[in-house]
């Protein structure tokens, strides 16, 4: 499974690791992904999602149905 947030689509970012002598080597900045089981009241069931921590904070504020509707995601397919 790829390291991508299922709601926001966030994925790894290319960056440089810079040493003391300022030599640069490429590295990845991965997304902080968490596996979450979230209650979906309209579907009357739990939905298991792989989410970034920013998406989890937004879910707590807006709610699952409103946030998925805003992003254009069909929860019935998950």
Curated annotation (Swiss-Prot):
GO biological process, one term: translation
One Pfam family matching this protein: Ribosomal_L28
Any one GO MF annotation of this record: structural constituent of ribosome
Keywords for the protein's UniProt record, in alphabetical order: Ribonucleoprotein, Ribosomal protein
GO cellular component labels: ribonucleoprotein complex; ribosome
Presence of keyword Ribonucleoprotein: yes
Superkingdom in the source lineage: Bacteria
Classification via HAMAP family: Ribosomal_bL28
Family per similarity comment: Belongs to the bacterial ribosomal protein bL28 family.
Protein name: Large ribosomal subunit protein bL28
Name of the coding gene: rpmB
């Amino acid at each position: 499974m790829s390291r991508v947030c299922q709601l926001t689509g966030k994925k790894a970012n290319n960056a440089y690791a810079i040493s003391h002598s300022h030599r640069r080597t490429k590295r990845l900045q991965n997304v902080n992904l968490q596996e979450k089981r979230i209650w979906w009241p309209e579907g009357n069931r739990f939905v298991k999602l792989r989410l970034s921590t920013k998406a989890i904070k937004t879910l707590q504020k807006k709610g699952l149905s409103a946030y998925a509707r805003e992003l254009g995601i069909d929860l019935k397919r998950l």
